[in-house]
UniProtKB/Swiss-Prot annotation:
Cross-referenced NCBIfam families: D-aminoacyl-tRNA deacylase
Domain of life: Bacteria
Cellular compartment(s): Cytoplasm
Quaternary data: Homodimer.
GO cellular component entries: cytoplasm
Protein name in UniProt: D-aminoacyl-tRNA deacylase
BP terms from Gene Ontology: D-amino acid catabolic process
């Protein structure tokens, strides 16, 4: 699983020029699901995501979590995070999960985030989406297998 987490002041996602998800202060999550990922993998990243302290406190230190600031999530599926361009110039996506399995884990990820009490908006799995956001910082973090070592 790979997550690109962008701290935002606001964001939205549109399909066919219609906004289908919109948040104020929070995170835009670009979520890539690999072929080896499981619900346990998702649980690990959800726990890490919801506890990340990357919002500033009164002293300007990144000490506050999404919950601390009543932040929201906009979760966007993005299999292209599994692009492998090591051979040639056209990326391969062989390490991305198959669409059916990826959608099931994506839905699970979103459901578990909602169960935490966090407001969650989403894109449309597999659709061509336009994501607009106002970065806050910018502050962007990538979570992937390397954090488990």
């Amino acid at each position: 699983m790979k997550l690109v987490i962008q701290r935002v002041k606001e964001a939205n996602v549109a399909v066919d020029e219609k906004v289908i998800g919109k948040i104020s202060k929070g995170y835009v999550i670009l979520l890539g699901i690999g072929k080896e990922d499981t619900k346990e993998t998702a649980d690990f990243y959800i726990n890490k995501l919801l506890k990340l302290r990357i919002f500033e406190d009164e002293q300007g230190k990144t000490n506050l979590s999404l919950e601390d600031v009543s932040g929201e999530l906009l979760v966007i599926s993005q299999f292209t995070l599994y692009a492998d361009a090591s051979k040639g110039n056209r990326p391969s996506f062989i390490n991305a999960a198959a669409p059916k399995e990826a959608e099931e884990l994506y839905d699970y990820f979103v459901m578990k985030c909602k169960e935490s009490g966090t407001t969650v908006e989403t894109g449309s799995f597999g659709a061509d989406m336009k994501v607009s956001l106002v970065n806050d910082g910018p502050f962007t973090i990538v979570l992937d297998e390397s954090i488990k070592k």
